[in-house]
Amino acid sequence: MTTTTRLAAGLILLALAACRREAAGPIHFAREEIDITVRPGAVEVLGTYHFTCSAEETVAAIISYPFPLDSVHGYPDSVVLPGRRFELADSAARFVMRFPPRGEASFTAWYRQPLSGSEARYIVTSTRQWRRPIDRAQFRVTVPADLPGATLNYRPDSTRRTDSTLTWFFTRLRFYPSEDVIVRWSDRAR
């Protein structure tokens, strides 16, 4: 990527970040489909993210795809963004994404993150940086059926239990979250 392209992408990102809620900018984070699989010691996330562009010309912007990092959530040991060149920096994968004029663009991401406690968190509060809600957010959260005391902080629309797994499903429209998706469980031995 040339210096000019980086500068232009950076300026566009700054312009998007500086927009007020009334004028959220030409890029809209429209939908996401998220599959979270939790087990003691690790969490895996597979997500597909869809955007619309209202601009008359192609827009390039730097996308920052964040991971929780704290005493429980280690740095991801695997990150995959198919078809994308990305850099890992701080607590995120960053890449340039091009949005076609008056069109849609999507990306898929997968990561595996080590856990050293009895909690797994998926960041959704970063949605607020887009300055308007996501039209539709769909989640599937799966844990081992024998994970003691497993709870989800969002109310599921439905639940499916098998001999080996418990899966929560929930969809939110006009999703503008004030808290991340969090799964907690008892740290006593299974």
Identify the meaning behind each predicted range:
Residues 1-8:
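Bacterial N-terminal signal peptides that target proteins for export
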Residues 11-20:
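Hydrophobic h-region of N-terminal signal peptides that target proteins for export
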Residues 19-190:
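Lumenal/extracellular ectodomains and adaptor appendage modules
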